[in-house]
Amino acid sequence: MLFADIIIDISVKSLDRPFQYRVPDPLQADAVIGALVDIPFGKGNRTVQGYIIGLSDQAKFDIRRTKDIIAVVKQGVVAQSHLLSLAYWIKTHYGGTMNDAIKAVMPVRREIQIKEKKRVIPIPTREDLRKIREELAGKHQTARVRIIDALLQAEDYADGMDYDVLCKAHKATLSVLRAMQDKGWIRIEVSRSYRNPYHTLHAADKEVILNEQQQKAVTQICGNMDAGQQQVYLLHGVTGSGKTEVYMQCIEHVIRSGRQAIVLIPEIALTFQTVQRFYARFGDRVSVMHSRLSAGERYDQFERAQTGEIDIMIGPRSALFTPFERLGIIVMDEEHESSYQSENVPKYHAREVAVQRAKMLGASVLLGSATPSLEAYYHTTTGEYTRIELTERAGGASLPRVEIVDLREELAAKNFSIFSRSLTAKIQKRLE
């Protein structure tokens, strides 16, 4: 007999504890840790949902009073056990309920309609199908003849035709196709189709030569990873010092070793050009998560990560919980940005959670900034983080000249604009 410890999907402090339910025999194969289930709850046995956080063959209470799970919700991304452990850490570290924490680490838990791709594949040889076509033409079975004609004219006969194209362009119907399938003339293949908002991007890699400081940073980080040393690095580099290329070289090293990477970028900085740069290097092994994606696109990207179809996830704070099991590195660009602090319960900071998740999986964390946060910089002085400096701009470019302006003098000169007189003059000169 199998029993499940379940956290109820209700964010109330009085219910913030596991409830034990019995798992009926037909549901035991699907009742895994992290699964979402329907259960009877309370005196009225109203149906609510909850998350399985533990399984046991021992009953904690009177078995006669233990209720049965109604159903396992099969559709949805199942939370991995280490993510549930991370949720518990978030709850104890930042407050809130366990349900709040689970929802934070499962940003795409809601059910989404799965998108399928169908193809109609001819079974007989092309010559045999032509004979079948002639026989059907003699019987005036025009619908079947029309479908066979389309299959015979397909560019790749063995690969058949797309189901939707066949239905729309050649007026095929499901009933006719099923009848032809029953005859053994065709088969309808159904496969999972993922919504990929960046499917038009292609890899176009070009070799980048690192300067001495960049190469030293990559060698240090990758060397420590190869030695099995899990560390947190603060890459303190001036603007234009080539921090992104250091990220990419380290990620490439991680991917070659069979592991995966998460790249956190503030939403405001997550531009098409940024995404294109990663696609140019890593191709379709990259996926992106951001708020502008539809619910279906978000769900599909997390499922692609869970099935191992991708190795790199790029996105803002929520991408931190990508269900990677072989996580090798978490990169956090512009780590000083305030958007990494959650404004909703639990009010976690992505930097601290990234470090905790990396500890759980033996991964490294690479923080990058030209103006590091006080917290990150302090950790480098205590030895908790390793600071790496990039003081030169990549490609030999010179640093911009900085001029300090005293705004009190601007006010004294009756200049109440947000622009100083010096800046205004230089803008006008540039426009001329």
Indicate residue ranges for each PLM-predicted region.
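Accessory, non-ATPase domains that flank or precede helicase/AAA+ motor cores in DNA-metabolism machines
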Residues: 1-369, 381-397, 431
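Short intrinsically disordered coil segments
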Residues: 21, 67-70, 404-405, 418-423
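Flexible loop/turn segments at secondary-structure boundaries
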Residues: 242, 374-376
